[in-house]
C-alpha cells in the first residue's frame, strides 16, 4: 500500500509539473507556414478542411476596378496635372474646392482693398466731404470685401466706385479682373468637363449577369450578352475581352493576374457591333482559346476572371464611352443558352429586357473542347451531337452515291430481283 501511494503521489506531482510547465512556458510551438504556391500544391488529404475561398475580383460587376494604389511617393505628379486631378475628384470635394477658391480670392483682394484704404488714410476721413478716397463709400473690411466681389463678378451696383486719384487702386483693379477671368475659366471648365463626362452613359450599357458555355454550329462557345437601354445609340461600338488569371512560366516565374486576350471576332470583324438591340457575343473555344482544355468538371476549380470591355462614341456628345463588367467561374454556366428577347410586332421589333439575364438549359457535352476534337478526329466524323443530324448526313451521302452511279444501282436492283425469283422457285 505504501509503494502504491508513493507511486500515485509521484505520478500526480509529475502531471502537475507538466501542466504548470505547459501554462507558464512562454515558448509556443507553431507549425511552419509554407508559401502560397506550396500550400496550393499540397494533396487534398493533408490539407486543412476549410471553406471554399472566394475569388477576389479584379473588376467589379459595375465596371469599377478593384485596385488601390498604395505607397505612392511621387505625389507631386498629381499637381502637375491639376486639371485632371480636380476632374477625377468626387463631387463633394469638387464643389468644396469650387466654393473655397472663389471665397479665398474674394477675401484676398478684399484685404488688399482695405489695406490700400487704410494706408492712404481713407478710414480717418470718412465724414470729410473734401477728401477724395481711393474707393468711395469704403468704410471698413466688410465694404472692401463686398467691393472685391462686385469687381471680380462684374456686378457693378454703382454705390462703391474707384476714383482716378488712386493709381495703385487702378493697377489692383486690372490684376483682379485678369485673375478673376482665369479663375472663372479654370473652375467653370472643370465643372463643365465633370458634368459632361460619359461615365453616366455607361450606366445604360448592360451586360448579362452570367456567361454561358454551349454548342453553337457544332462548336463549343463561350457567350455573354450586351445591350443598350437608350434610344440614342453608341457609334462605332466595339467589344473585347480579357482573361485575368495568374500563371507560372516554365522558368518558375510567377505572374499574378496575367492578362491574355479572348478572341470575340477580331479577325472576322464580329467585334464591331451595331448595338441597336441586345447582342450575344460569342467566343469559339478552339486551340488558341484559353478554355481549350477546361471541361465542365474542371471549370469550378479554376481561379480566373473574364473582363469584358465595350467601347464606343456617344451619339449625342461625340465623346468616347467605355463600359466594363466581369465574370468569375461561379458566374459561367455550362450547358445553358440565353433566352431570346427580340420579338417582331406590328411594324416594329420589341425588346423584352425582363428576359435579358434569363437562361435555359440545353444539351451540351461536359467534355473540354480539346477532348471533343480528339473524339471527332478518332471517329473521323464532324463534331455533332445530334443523332438525327447523323442519320440525315448518312442519308445525304447515300443519295449522292446514287446520283453519281445510277447504272450500278440498276444492276444491283436487277440482281436482287433475280435472287428473289430463284428463291421462290
Swiss-Prot record:
InterPro entries: Ig_E-set, IRK_C, K_chnl_inward-rec_Kir, K_chnl_inward-rec_Kir3.2, K_chnl_inward-rec_Kir_cyto, Kir_TM
One example of a Gene Ontology biological process annotation: negative regulation of insulin secretion
Matching Gene3D superfamilies: 1.10.287.70, G protein-activated inward rectifier potassium channel 1
Site (Role in the control of polyamine-mediated channel gating and in the blocking by intracellular magnesium): 184
Mechanisms controlling activity: Activated by phosphatidylinositol 4,5 biphosphate (PtdIns(4,5)P2).
Protein name: G protein-activated inward rectifier potassium channel 2
Span(s) of short sequence motif PDZ-binding: 422-425
Chain spans, region Disordered: 392-425
Major place of residence: membrane
Keyword Thylakoid included in the entry's annotation: no
Subunit-level organization: Associates with KCNJ3/GIRK1to form a G-protein-activated heteromultimer pore-forming unit. Associates with KCNJ5/GRIK4 to form a G-protein-activated heteromultimer pore-forming unit. The resulting inward current is much larger. Interacts (via PDZ-binding motif) with SNX27 (via PDZ domain); the interaction is required when endocytosed to prevent degradation in lysosomes and promote recycling to the plasma membrane.
SUPFAM superfamilies: E set domains, Voltage-gated potassium channels
Membrane topology: Multi-pass membrane protein
Disease: Defects in Kcnj6 are the cause of the weaver (wv) phenotype. Homozygous animals suffer from severe ataxia that is obvious by about the second postnatal week. The cerebellum of these animals is drastically reduced in size due to depletion of the major cell type of cerebellum, the granule cell neuron. Heterozygous animals are not ataxic but have an intermediate number of surviving granule cells. Male homozygotes are sterile, because of complete failure of sperm production. Both hetero- and homozygous animals undergo sporadic tonic-clonic seizures.
Keywords: Disease variant, Ion channel, Ion transport, Membrane, Phosphoprotein, Potassium, Potassium transport, Transmembrane, Transmembrane helix, Transport, Voltage-gated channel
GO CC, any one term: postsynapse
Short motif (Selectivity filter): ranges: 154-159
Family recorded in the similarity comment: Belongs to the inward rectifier-type potassium channel (TC 1.A.2.1) family. KCNJ6 subfamily.
Expression by tissue: Expressed in the brain.
Function: Inward rectifier potassium channels are characterized by a greater tendency to allow potassium to flow into the cell rather than out of it. Their voltage dependence is regulated by the concentration of extracellular potassium; as external potassium is raised, the voltage range of the channel opening shifts to more positive voltages. The inward rectification is mainly due to the blockage of outward current by internal magnesium. This potassium channel is controlled by G proteins. Forms a functional channel in association with KCNJ3/GIRK1.
Modified residues (Phosphoserine): 18, 25
Location in the cell: Membrane
Amino acid at each position: 500500500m505504501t509503494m502504491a501511494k508513493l507511486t500515485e503521489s509521484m505520478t500526480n506531482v509529475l502531471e502537475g509539473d507538466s501542466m504548470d510547465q505547459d501554462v507558464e512556458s512562454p515558448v509556443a510551438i507553431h507549425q511552419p507556414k509554407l508559401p502560397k504556391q506550396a500550400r496550393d500544391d499540397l494533396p487534398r488529404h493533408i490539407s486543412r478542411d476549410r471553406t471554399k475561398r472566394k475569388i477576389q475580383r479584379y473588376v467589379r460587376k459595375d465596371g469599377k476596378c478593384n485596385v488601390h494604389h498604395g505607397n505612392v511617393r511621387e505625389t507631386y505628379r498629381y499637381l502637375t496635372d491639376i486639371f485632371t486631378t480636380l476632374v477625377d475628384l468626387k463631387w463633394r470635394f469638387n464643389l468644396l474646392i469650387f466654393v473655397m477658391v472663389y471665397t479665398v480670392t474674394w477675401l484676398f483682394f478684399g484685404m488688399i482693398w482695405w489695406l490700400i484704404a487704410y494706408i492712404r488714410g481713407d478710414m480717418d476721413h470718412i465724414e470729410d466731404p473734401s477728401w477724395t478716397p481711393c474707393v468711395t463709400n469704403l468704410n471698413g473690411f466688410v465694404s472692401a470685401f463686398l467691393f472685391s466681389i462686385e469687381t471680380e463678378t462684374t456686378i457693378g451696383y454703382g454705390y462703391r466706385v474707384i476714383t482716378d486719384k488712386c493709381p495703385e487702386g487702378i493697377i489692383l483693379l486690372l490684376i483682379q479682373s485678369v485673375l478673376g477671368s482665369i479663375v472663372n475659366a479654370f473652375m467653370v471648365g472643370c465643372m463643365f468637363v465633370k458634368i459632361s463626362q460619359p461615365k453616366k452613359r455607361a450606366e445604360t450599357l448592360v451586360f448579362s449577369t452570367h456567361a454561358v458555355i454551349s454548342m453553337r454550329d457544332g462548336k463549343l462557345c463561350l457567350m455573354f450578352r450586351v445591350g443598350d437601354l437608350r434610344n440614342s445609340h453608341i457609334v462605332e461600338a466595339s467589344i473585347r475581352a480579357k482573361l485575368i488569371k495568374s500563371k507560372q512560366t516554365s522558368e518558375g516565374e510567377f505572374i499574378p493576374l496575367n492578362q491574355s486576350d479572348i478572341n470575340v471576332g477580331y479577325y472576322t470583324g464580329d467585334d464591331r457591333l451595331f448595338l441597336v438591340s441586345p447582342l450575344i457575343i460569342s467566343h469559339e473555344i478552339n486551340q488558341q482559346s484559353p478554355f481549350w482544355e477546361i471541361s465542365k468538371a474542371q471549370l469550378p476549380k479554376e481561379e480566373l476572371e473574364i473582363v469584358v470591355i465595350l467601347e464606343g462614341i456617344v451619339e449625342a456628345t461625340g465623346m468616347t464611352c467605355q463600359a466594363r463588367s466581369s465574370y468569375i467561374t461561379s458566374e459561367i454556366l455550362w450547358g445553358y443558352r440565353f433566352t431570346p428577347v427580340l420579338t417582331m410586332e406590328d411594324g416594329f421589333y420589341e425588346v423584352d429586357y425582363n428576359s435579358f439575364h434569363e437562361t435555359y438549359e440545353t444539351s451540351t457535352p461536359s467534355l473540354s473542347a480539346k477532348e471533343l476534337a480528339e473524339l471527332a478526329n478518332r471517329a473521323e466524323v464532324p463534331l455533332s451531337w445530334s443523332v438525327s443530324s447523323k442519320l440525315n448526313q448518312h442519308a445525304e451521302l447515300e443519295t449522292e452515291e446514287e446520283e453519281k452511279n445510277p447504272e450500278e444501282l440498276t444492276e444491283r436492283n436487277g440482281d436482287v430481283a433475280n435472287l428473289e425469283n430463284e428463291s421462290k422457285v
